[in-house]
A protein has these predicted regions:
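Short runs within selected transmembrane alpha-helices of multi-pass transporters and secretion channels
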Residues: 76, 145-163, 171-179, 200-215, ...
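Transmembrane helix-bundle signature of multi-pass secondary active exporters and lipid flippases
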Residues: 29-81, 145-152, 241-319, 340-348, ...
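Membrane-helix boundary and inter-helical linker elements of multi-pass secondary transporters
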Residues: 48-51, 85, 164, 193, ...
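Juxtamembrane/transmembrane-helix interface segments of polytopic membrane transporters
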Residues: 35, 39, 43, 47, ...
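Small-residue-rich hydrophobic transmembrane alpha-helices
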Residues: 55-115, 152-171, 289-349, 353-355, ...
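Short alpha-helical transmembrane segments in multi-pass integral membrane proteins
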Residues: 1-25, 83-150, 192-248, 317-383, ...
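Hydrophobic/aromatic residues in alpha-helical transmembrane segments
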Residues: 26, 42, 79-80, 120-121, ...
């Protein structure tokens, strides 16, 4: 190992905790913000240029988009894990085969998604609760996204390999370029060309095409040690099997998230039609879907940077835990808790007391939707300030190699607690119960995470 690499590793056990946390968290925060922008920018410009019907259409497509992301994650993370191991073993031919097989799998996955999507898209959207008003809008948006599915899989999937080859800034730069392109193209296609909901879809696909082209260009450059090569793109079953097996655990949560969003969309439509009055523009169910689309965009923009901050602490916790520097492990946890809580308390206060101001830009011409979204945000975000308890605890278990406990804690908030409450509460509280399921799951996951963390910390002396 080089002296420089040794010094970098040793700094985990000697450098200032705040400095280390910020050093590793800032790139992760930027990466997460980039991902959040893809979600929030489309809905912002659609709200401005298309209206509430457009927001409802995009929101109905979200479970399918999450499924595509899960497939990309399965191949990208699974392939990259195996790729990194072979790099460490200096088995560069095998590493090249793994990289190229992953590239082929991402393309095949996208083609399969496009074909299946064309067949099942309309039945799925109806199952999620699409009405006669929202189905044409959602179908128009989703059909274009399916057409460009290959770019949605290649861009995030292959970016993992760039990081493993020692170019994290290059990977981040390509993500940022994609996000900035999306903002510019959304404004151009929706606000200037007036392409409506199709403009939002074409902006997303075009920006991902740009990101995919930049990422592919990295792998064909002369100075890239492991390139995309035709002769290594032929699928080898032993590698394909390992890639998929390694990729299933990280993609499983995303698949569960897709399922949860499908149940949520159905619940919003069903109980929105009961609890909300038809406005003439939107039915009660469509209004509930649009309101959730706005709330979810704002919540994602708040949560994803927090996730980046928390995930940035994992290598620091892992190194010091392995080195038995338990005082530094506890110091890292304390620092992370303080800043995560501080950030979330400010965000929670804004959600509670400035809800109207936060939702207004998404529906400038629909006061009823603004009112509904602000009401929903105050319920949905009621326990947001408690989220750091579960997130930091989960990150601790991930960093110390206890992946199953980490998966359990992440699953508590998104699946294990949320889905049962989502299915039960609306029977008693109608639409309010749909939005109340999330804060109850947030609080439950926080208490479970804290209990598990305190139990584990007692073992650290």
């Amino acid at each position: 190992m080089s002296t420089l690499n040794s010094q970098r590793l040793n700094s985990f056990g000697t450098a200032s905790i705040p400095k280390l946390v910020l050093q590793f968290s800032v790139p992760a925060i930027i990466s997460m913000l980039v991902n959040a922008l893809y979600n929030i920018v489309d809905r912002f410009f659609v709200g401005q240029g298309v209206g509430s019907l457009g927001i409802a259409g995009i929101t109905l497509c979200f479970p399918i988009c999450l499924f595509i992301m899960a497939m990309s994650m399965m191949i990208g993370v699974g392939g990259n894990t195996l790729f990194a191991i072979r790099l460490g073993q200096k088995k560069y031919i095998q590493a090249s085969i793994i990289l190229n097989n992953s590239f082929t799998l991402l393309i095949l996955m996208a083609v399969s998604t496009f074909a299946l999507g064309e067949i099942f898209m309309v039945p799925l959207l109806k199952l999620f609760g699409a009405s006669e008003q929202t189905l044409p809008v959602a179908s128009s948006y989703m059909r274009i996204l399916l057409f460009g599915a290959v770019f949605q899989t290649i861009a995030p999937g292959m970016n993992h390999f760039i990081r493993s080859m020692g170019h994290p800034k290059t990977a981040m730069f390509r993500e940022v370029i994609g996000a900035v392109s999306n903002i510019i193209l959304d404004w151009l296609f929706i606000m200037k060309f007036h392409w409506g909901i199709e403009g939002a879809a074409w902006a997303t696909i075009s920006s991902q095409l740009i990101a995919s082209a930049l990422i592919t260009q990295f792998f064909v450059k002369k100075d890239t040690p492991i390139k995309i090569r035709w002769r290594h793109m032929k699928l080898r079953f032993p590698y394909v099997r390992k890639i998929i097996i390694l990729g299933i655990p990280p993609s499983l949560m995303q698949l569960c998230n897709s399922l949860m969003n499908a149940i949520l969309a159905w619940s919003l439509t069903t109980y929105g039609n009961i609890s909300l009055h038809d406005t003439g523009v939107l039915s009660g169910g469509d209004m509930a879907i649009s309101a959730f689309g706005i709330v979810n965009s704002i919540a994602s923009f708040i949560l994803l940077p927090l996730l980046g901050f928390v995930h940035g602490t994992q290598p620091i916790i892992g190194y010091n835990y392995g080195a038995r520097l338990n005082a530094r492990v506890k110091a890292t946890l304390k620092f992370t808790f303080i800043y995560a809580f501080g950030f979330m308390i400010v965000a929670w206060a804004l959600m509670m007391w400035q809800a109207e101001a936060l939702v207004a830009p998404f529906a400038p011409n629909d006061l009823k939707l603004q009112e509904t979204a602000a009401w929903a945000m105050r319920i949905f975000g009621a326990a947001f300030f408690m989220i750091p308890l579960g997130l930091v605890s989960g990150s601790f278990f991930q960093g110390t190699g206890k992946a199953l406990r980490s998966m359990f804690l992440n699953g508590c908030r998104q699946v294990i607690l949320l889905i049962p409450f989502l299915l039960v509460l609306p029977h008693f509280l109608e639409l309010k119960g749909v939005f109340m399921a999330q804060p109850i799951a947030d609080a439950g996951a926080a208490f479970i995470g804290l209990a598990m963390l305190l139990h584990e910390l007692k073992k650290l002396k």
